Amino acid sequence: MVTDVRDAILRADVDGVAAVLAQDVVWIGTQPGQLCRSRAQVLDLFHRAVERGVSAKPEIVAELENMLVVDPHLDPPAEFNPELHQIYVLDEGAIVEMRDYPDRPSALEAVGLR
């Protein structure tokens, strides 16, 4: 299942990622109030980004037993977080938590790799 998650992320395929999101996935942004508490809310944000012309070329920069550190390589970059990185927490082949970090060093530090 982790391979499915990795493949969906690396393809930057919204439908593929949707298939591996837990129904109760939580996405925590870097700013106060940036919080999604369901698959539907996460997908709504993804779809709105696509409608605005945002694209991604994700790179998995670190892989732990149940976590992936991802550089989404957004184009155009996120306005408030141009070096945005994310940690995806996995459980039984599904993404159960997504957490944003302002840059690679802070994301790697959060998983104990710095």
Question: Can you name each region flagged by the protein language model?
Answer:
Residues 1-114:
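C-terminal and inter-domain tail/linker signature
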